[in-house]
Amino acid sequence: MPLSLLQELIKRPSITPQECGIYEIILNKLNSLIQKEHIDTFIIEQEKEGVKNLFYLIAPKGADKSNLHHFCFAGHIDVVPTGEGWEFEPFCGTQDEKYIYGRGTQDMKGGISAFICAVCNILESHNTSSLPIMLSILLTSDEEGEGIYGTKFMLEELKKRDLLPHSCIVAEPTSINHTGDMLKIGRRGSINGTLIIEGKQGHVAYPQKCINPIELLGSKLGALAGIELDNGDSHFAPSKLVITDIRSGMEVVNVTPQNLKIMFNVRNSPLSNEDSIRSYITSILGSLPYELTLKTNSLPFITADDSEIVKSLCAIIERTLGITPQLSTSGGTSDARFFASYGVNVVEIGVPNDRIHAINERVSISDILALHDIFVEFLQLFIKNAKIENLK
């Protein structure tokens, strides 16, 4: 059951990038169910710069793997620090009638427990001698941190070994009120920017001898701050320039500043990019003396809402839970972007996210069980469809 596995994982204080023996728990659970006469397994455990990653591949024994669809479950076992003021110990997995409490219950050990147990269900109940797909699990201990040596690094390794999946579910906590009410079928990109307006420092009593960068920018700030850079589309909200910091001067009243520095971020739709943002800012600033630096942290991506993975998940959720999931690209960046960069059809689905990174983080027992059941049904449907496809 996913509940007992979740409690076991919560008891491991895997604050980024610590792994705390979680992979051993998962490997033991999976390995105990592998029928070696029918199944080949391929395991990669890698550690780099303190980050530990696990890739576990299940494939039918002796099959031509180039002809099999490869589906992957992915997630991160690391959690953010707990802070103080918890009602329950954050690494105990306390359970009452409705909830399990602890750091990572929602983000995202709950999702991991659900898909690990779903895979175990398939291994226990399915005739693995006729498994028509490759099934894998990819886990990292560095998603909440810099993410350099986590999922991104592992996908680079998988590409070298020709083991990239064709489709993937990342079990991030995407839901709002109940498991399944929102799927993330894409994400906006993220572009950071720094703008420096150059001036000439001087005595405030002689403004004619100074060039005040604050005054230079003043009339133009309204065309930058909070401006929508495009109209968005049916899946993406408009790209918006959000100023996060403005600094100038020396905190004195008798010296005009030498320069003014603005830091900003754009969460961008596919309709905007570095070039279009630079062009827009240039058109606003005109001949002002300035220096602009832009850096793309992640690209926007979308998995088509008529793709098999999206249609299958929606159909299962509607049938089993009686709700129609909202297809969204909202929120921050996630490791799903790394899969998308390799052309993998990726969807994020998980438990609600109302308590992520918060004191007294908790997950509803019913939400965990619902997610587990969705994953089981998805795998069963995926296997059934693969068998039909193989018969054609």
Swiss-Prot record:
- Recorded family membership: Belongs to the peptidase M20A family. DapE subfamily.
Put simply, this protein is called: Succinyl-diaminopimelate desuccinylase
Q: Where does Zn(2+) 2 bind?
A: D107, E144, H357
Q: What are the names of the required cofactors?
A: Zn(2+); Co(2+)
Q: Provide the reaction this enzyme catalyses.
A: N-succinyl-(2S,6S)-2,6-diaminopimelate + H2O = (2S,6S)-2,6-diaminopimelate + succinate
* Residues at the catalytic site: D78, E143 (proton acceptor)
- Enumerate the HAMAP family for this protein: DapE
